[in-house]
Amino acid sequence: MRKILAKHGYEVWARWESEAEIFELFSDSDAVGYIGFAESIAEAIKIGTWHIEEQHSEATWNGS
């Protein structure tokens, strides 16, 4: 498991799943907050960036 992004107080962690040959993405290092999966680290970063921006946007919209 390795942290691939951190921004606005949010993190994205990636874990390589060798059997399926994908990266599983999580919002924490304990692999509790599942985000999705990606076939490459570049795709994982794109998905992670989108996830963080969505979380930040929702928090900003709700006044958090």
Where are these regions (language model features)?
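Short N-terminal "domain-start" leader segments
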Residues: M1-I22
